[in-house]
Design a protein with these regions (language model features):
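Hydrophobic membrane-spanning alpha-helices of multi-pass integral membrane proteins
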Residues: 179-187, 241-246
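C-terminal functional extensions of proteins
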Residues: 224, 235-259
């Protein structure tokens, strides 16, 4: 599958990740062009890749990457928009829409941070949980994986992320009374399906923390807690969704005395 017409994109905060370096070298051996999105300037991947885009997030002091993850997402958005432009796949209207969505992100995330006390309160209720499960569909599932990873990395709580569409195929058997479920509900055309998933886990005794775009107040009837996100284009919504998940993990870890 990999030849001289293949572009391999490598994403690494440190630029020293052993398996990513091995994949890069194998791709280059097969003739592929390699493009790295890296935070650490002058790192191995940055030096050896054919092209590199630095995210300039600054050093990550903690084990878990947070700001670098957010800048990596932004780099991917920009690259995708640029490539779509080059392939003449974006109308001027769509291009303007996506650029505006990116420009709004800093303000939207600032608004989220103003409400971090709410996330801290939720964390204070469930920082001693044995397991926390994350559910999402399509883009939300990708963010669920990141949220679950962060919680595991810094709080040492057992956590897994599952595609909500597969809930009935084994996953739901893990839900019992008091299990904490974080349900990501920001994909507009799948919102009703996520509501259905929330009802299913609630019926088995789960405590549900939902993350949804502001305006979807009907979710309050089903979830125990709702974290609302400022409205934004669905394309860049993962950049907003990940912030409360990072904060939740941080507060849980801090309350457990692991900071």
């Amino acid at each position: 599958l990999v030849d001289d017409k293949t572009l391999v994109i490598l994403i690494s905060q440190s630029g020293e990740t052993a398996d990513t370096i091995a994949a890069m070298r194998e791709a280059k051996r097969l003739g592929a062009r390699t493009f790295a999105i890296v935070n650490a300037v002058g790192s191995c991947i940055a030096r050896e890749a054919d092209d590199v885009l630095y995210t300039w997030a600054g050093p990550e002091i903690a084990v878990a990457t947070t700001k670098a993850y957010s800048t990596q997402l932004t780099a991917i958005y920009l690259m995708s928009i640029y490539m779509a432009q080059e392939l003449d796949m974006l109308t001027p209207e769509l291009l303007a829409k996506y650029i505006k969505a990116l420009e709004k992100l800093p303000d939207n995330i600032s608004k989220l941070l103003e409400n971090k006390g709410e996330i801290q309160y939720i964390a204070s209720k469930y920082f001693n949980s044995k397991s926390v499960f994350f559910l999402g569909r399509t883009l939300d599932y990708a963010v669920a994986l990141e949220g679950s990873l962060k919680l595991k990395e810094i709080s040492y709580i057992h956590s897994e992320a599952y595609a909500a569409g597969e809930l009935k195929h084994g996953t739901i058997a893990l839900i019992e009374e008091g299990t904490v479920v974080v349900a990501l509900c920001t994909v507009k055309n799948l919102f009703d399906k996520m509501l259905s998933n929330i009802k299913e886990v609630k019926a088995r005794g789960a405590v549900v923390i939902a993350v949804a775009e502001e305006g979807h107040t009907e979710i309050e009837k089903e979830a125990d807690y709702v974290i609302y996100l400022p409205k934004c284009d669905e394309l860049v919504m993962p950049s907003e969704v990940v912030v409360p998940l990072q904060l939740f993990s941080y507060y849980v870890s801090s309350l457990k005395g692991l900071d």
